[in-house]
């Protein structure tokens, strides 16, 4: 697969991975990347935590997206920037991994992730455990080749209803084919939760109007796997919570909740 360990792999090197200490890694966004949204910094932290968790369980199990208590976006970054990654594993069991983390760019905080929880599932359902073990060895020694990712496309989001400043409703079309499906995951391709959050943040910012930016997410809960070619019904309802602009966002697949979250916005 041409995209394997390339199209959606955001750890170039693992610098420290002792189980009782902060896991550290590094990723440089390729200079040629067409689009690299802030949500992918959270993906990088999650991948770093996943590598450490998988290694501790001998690659028999792997975590998948589940819950994230809070994600805060800091200084902007983009193609050519190097992301210094940190993940603190609060617990690793055969049922789940609990972790927090952050991303630094040029010494400044680009992202903080708190209280994330990833359910553990058999690694062989999603990937070849032998390939994972070999790639971990690469990441902890020579490091992966640079410039692997070409970026990700903007979300295929159609707005059906818009009540500016209050509500938006639409559909998100998951592509039937995309390079990142070869990486996420080879044996069971699913739409990445961090790309879903990018799309839902875009929906919330559209509902809020001009001169608004997304500053974070709270209470993210991913309920189901979203396969290639699926269409999600997405809504956001905005509210002013003691001077803080927030949005309750819901994604449904085939009429049932697929993911929920609360988005934090700021007027610029």
For each predicted feature, which ranges?
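Non-catalytic linker/capping segments at the edges of enzyme domains
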Residues: 1-35, 60, 74-79, 90-96, ...
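Generic secondary-structure microfeatures
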Residues: 29, 46-49, 174-176, 201
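Compact, glycine-rich, soluble single-domain proteins
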Residues: 33, 37-51, 186-189, 197
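N-terminal cationic amphipathic segment used for targeting or macromolecule association
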Residues: 44, 63-65, 166
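Hydrophobic beta-strand-centered segment that forms part of the acyl-chain substrate-binding groove
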Residues: 49-86, 110-111, 117-118, 201-235, ...
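Short beta-strand/loop motifs in extracellular/secreted proteins, especially
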Residues: 99
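Internal, hydrophobic beta-strand segments that form the core of beta-sheet-rich folds
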Residues: 102-104
């Amino acid at each position: 697969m041409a995209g394997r360990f390339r199209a959606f792999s955001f750890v170039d090197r693992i610098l420290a991975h002792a189980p009782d200490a902060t896991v550290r890694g590094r990723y440089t966004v390729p200079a040629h990347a067409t689009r690299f949204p802030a949500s992918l910094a959270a993906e990088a932290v999650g991948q770093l935590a996943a590598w450490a968790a998988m290694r501790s369980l001998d690659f028999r199990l792997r975590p998948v997206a589940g819950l994230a208590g809070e994600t805060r976006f800091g200084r902007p970054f983009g193609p050519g920037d190097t992301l210094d990654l940190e993940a603190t594993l609060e617990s690793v069991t055969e049922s789940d991994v609990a972790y927090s983390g952050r991303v630094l760019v040029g010494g400044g905080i680009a992202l903080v992730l708190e209280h994330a929880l990833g359910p553990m599932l058999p690694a062989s359902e999603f990937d070849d455990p032998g390939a994972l073990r070999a790639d971990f060895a690469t990441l902890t020694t020579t490091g992966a080749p640079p410039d692997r990712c070409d970026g990700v496309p903007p979300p295929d989001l159609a707005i059906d209803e818009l009540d500016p400043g209050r509500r938006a409703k639409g559909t998100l079309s998951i592509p039937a084919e995309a390079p990142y499906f070869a990486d996420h995951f080879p044996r069971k391709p699913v739409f990445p939760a961090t790309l879903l959050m990018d799309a839902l943040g875009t929906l919330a910012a559209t509902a809020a109007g001009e001169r608004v930016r997304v500053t974070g997410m709270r209470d993210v809960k991913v309920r189901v796997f979203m396969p290639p070619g699926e269409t999600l019904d997405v809504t956001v309802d905005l509210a002013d919570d003691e001077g803080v602009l927030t949005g309750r966002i819901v994604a449904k697949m085939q009429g049932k909740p697929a993911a929920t979250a609360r988005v934090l916005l700021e007027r610029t």
